[in-house]
């Protein structure tokens, strides 16, 4: 029987949909193994990597998706020119890969549809990685070490059990596409607005508002918030705990510009006064420390969306300087319907 041949003249060895449980790559001549740059093995019944796979010394792409693999052996470490590893829909988890995998110069890693409960440390060592897909797994968190993937442009973590977004994502200078849909995320850290390269953001989760800093994502072209319990009417949440005497004194000092120097106050009070936040209402000029009013305002974004953003005010008497106005009880039905349509652009992505 003749061995499998390189197909299409494109340095591709295609062994897809053959129902193979074992594969003898020695049937491929040594010269042809050196020519092959793409090895396609999806939709078989492979449990482990075929023996001698590391003899494909010029391999750039390896596709082992839709098999029965629970373990990737050290043979993969011999594929020193490998750029793309596709292993979707297997039985892989965080213990399935050799510790030295981080030494490969991978650029694309797609492991969606597996059994990962956390992102393995060795994945977070691949600084050449541009695309990481771990959708449809069992991830519960995104590690802070995600910031080590300094070349990352595309991150797909949809369909997991993630409950929070680490602020360290803001340290990825080239991140352009971020997909976190179908998780359990309830809030977005304001640091995410520092990812100025972000062009597409998918957040179908449990969000009720967005931080106002999101408006600084001027490169954003796609924003999908479908399925979130975002409020669709203007919401005034004025639950307010009166400020302490310490805060009242601090507000008075900062608002009235009362002079003080380090020799006059204890160190803890000096540090406290440095924590003052300015009220966003330009007509107010006040400050707050620990006690503030949280208020949701709808703000026009990119001329297309009305986003519910969180504002922090110094007191209930203060009104937020948001450009958009609230829907009052006297709004006409047509105006209310128009607002609903604008919100639908966000809710439906």
Curated annotation (Swiss-Prot):
Protein biosynthesis found in the keyword field: no
Keywords: Leucine-rich repeat, Repeat
InterPro entries to which the protein is assigned, alphabetical: Leu-rich_rpt, Leu-rich_rpt_typical-subtyp, LRR-SigEffector_domain, LRR_dom_sf
LRR repeats: 14-34, 35-56, 58-80, 81-102, 105-125, 128-149, 151-173, 174-195, 197-217, 219-239
Cross-referenced Pfam families: LRR_8
Entry-linked PANTHER family: LEUCINE-RICH REPEAT-CONTAINING, LEUCINE-RICH REPEAT-CONTAINING PROTEIN 58
Protein name: Leucine-rich repeat-containing protein 58
Organism of origin: Xenopus tropicalis (Western clawed frog)
């Amino acid at each position: 029987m003749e061995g499998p041949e390189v197909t299409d003249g494109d340095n591709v060895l295609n062994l897809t949909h053959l129902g193979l449980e074992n594969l003898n790559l020695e049937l491929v001549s040594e010269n042809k193994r050196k020519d092959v740059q793409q090895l396609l093995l999806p939709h078989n019944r492979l449990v482990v990597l075929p023996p001698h796979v590391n003899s494909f010394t010029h391999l750039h792409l390896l596709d082992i998706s839709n098999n029965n693999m629970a373990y990737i052996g050290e043979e993969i470490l011999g594929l020193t020119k490998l750029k793309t590893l596709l292993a979707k829909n297997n039985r892989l988890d965080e213990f399935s890969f050799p510790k030295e995998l981080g030494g490969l110069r991978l650029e694309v890693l797609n492991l969606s549809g597996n059994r990962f409960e956390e992102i393995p440390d060795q994945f977070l060592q691949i600084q050449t990685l541009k695309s990481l897909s771990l959708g449809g797994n069992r991830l519960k968190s995104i590690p802070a070490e995600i910031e080590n993937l300094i070349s990352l442009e595309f991150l797909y973590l949809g369909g997991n059990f993630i409950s929070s977004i680490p602020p360290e994502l803001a340290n990825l200078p080239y991140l352009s596409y971020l997909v976190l849909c179908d998780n359990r995320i309830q809030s977005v850290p304001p640091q995410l607005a520092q990812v100025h390269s972000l062009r597409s953001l998918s957040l179908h989760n449990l969000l009720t508002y967005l931080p106002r800093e999101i408006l600084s994502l001027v490169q954003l072209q796609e924003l999908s918030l479908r399925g979130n319990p975002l409020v669709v009417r203007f919401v005034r949440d004025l639950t307010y705990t009166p400020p302490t005497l310490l805060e009242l004194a601090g507000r008075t000092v900062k608002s009235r510009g009362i002079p003080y120097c380090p020799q006059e106050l204890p160190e803890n009070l000096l540090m406290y006064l440095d924590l003052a936040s300015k009220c966003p209402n330009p007509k107010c000029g006040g400050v707050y420390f620990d006690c503030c009013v949280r208020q949701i305002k709808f703000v026009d974004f990119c001329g297309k969306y009305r986003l519910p953003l969180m504002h922090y005010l110094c007191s209930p008497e203060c009104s937020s300087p948001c450009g958009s106005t609230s829907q009052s009880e006297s709004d006409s039905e047509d105006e209310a319907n128009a607002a609903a349509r604008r919100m639908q652009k966000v809710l439906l992505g």
